């Protein structure tokens, strides 16, 4: 039986890493994942060895000339194609589970709504890169722009995080639009960590029940 593919999305500072860690610990402690199957935690960009090099090209602030918007889009697509073929598809085919910090939603939100690139072009590239692989459920951890800025105040921003408030606002609007899809679940990430993970657990139980 094919494994489950769970994705976490959201603007920077939304708490994806924290909730992924909480969910993974909980899943490992339960019998929701079939016996003899495992849980793989990954991320985009940078989920593979090649992807780590691409991540550096995309996010490194020390690079003198940043990639233009189309180059950036193609690099993300290359990272995703490698990620799907090397990690995600083989893992799911074995019946194992995958939790990914970002997937296609981020490209649509950041490059589509943020960079204002053509959405149809992005979707066409995603179709090539993903080869039909899609999440069983995507959690959008939703926080206001001001909260994102506050949470990131004491950490060093990467190249994307250094974009201005207007860019971040457009990205947030993109995520809001994407979360209307039935496979997305929007969760307020300004609630307590306990409440957030409780909602996530509830949705995972529903996912298993309706399989």
Swiss-Prot record:
This is Thymidylate kinase. GO terms for biological process: dTDP biosynthetic process; dTTP biosynthetic process; dUDP biosynthetic process. Belongs to the thymidylate kinase family. Keywords: ATP-binding, Kinase, Nucleotide biosynthesis, Nucleotide-binding, Transferase. GO terms for cellular component: cytosol. CDD domains: TMPK. Its EC number is 2.7.4.9. It holds the Pfam family Thymidylate_kin. The gene is tmk. One of its GO terms (molecular function) is dTMP kinase activity. It comes from the Bacteria. It catalyses: dTMP + ATP = dTDP + ADP. SUPFAM superfamilies: P-loop containing nucleoside triphosphate hydrolases. PROSITE patterns: THYMIDYLATE_KINASE. ATP binds at residues 10-17. It comes from Prochlorococcus marinus (strain NATL1A). InterPro entries: P-loop_NTPase, Thymidylate_kin-like_dom, Thymidylate_kin_CS, Thymidylate_kinase. PANTHER family: THYMIDYLATE KINASE (PTHR10344), UMP-CMP KINASE 2, MITOCHONDRIAL (PTHR10344:SF4). It is an enzyme of class 2 (transferase). NCBIfam families: DTMP_kinase. Phosphorylation of dTMP to form dTDP in both de novo and salvage pathways of dTTP synthesis.
């Amino acid at each position: 039986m094919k494994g489950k593919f769970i994705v976490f999305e959201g603007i920077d500072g939304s708490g994806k890493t924290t909730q992924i860690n909480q969910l993974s610990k909980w899943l490992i402690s339960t019998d929701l994942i079939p016996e003899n199957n495992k849980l793989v935690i990954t991320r985009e960009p940078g989920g593979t060895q090649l992807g780590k090099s691409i991540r550096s090209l995309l996010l490194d602030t020390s690079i003198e000339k940043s990639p233009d918007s189309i180059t950036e889009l193609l690099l993300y697509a290359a990272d995703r194609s490698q990620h799907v073929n090397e990690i995600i598809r083989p893992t799911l085919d074995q019946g194992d589970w995958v939790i990914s910090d970002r997937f296609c939603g981020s490209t649509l939100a950041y490059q589509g709504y943020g960079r204002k690139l053509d959405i149809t072009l992005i979707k066409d590239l995603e179709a090539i890169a993903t080869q039909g692989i899609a999440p069983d459920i995507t959690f959008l951890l939703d926080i206001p722009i001001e909260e994102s800025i506050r949470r990131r105040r004491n950490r060093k921003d990467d190249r994307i995080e250094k974009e201005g408030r207007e860019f971040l606002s457009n990205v947030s609007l993109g995520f809001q639009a994407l979360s209307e899809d039935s496979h997305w679940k929007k969760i307020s990430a300004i609630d307590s960590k306990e409440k957030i993970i409780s909602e996530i657990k509830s949705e995972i139980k529903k996912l298993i029940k309706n399989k």
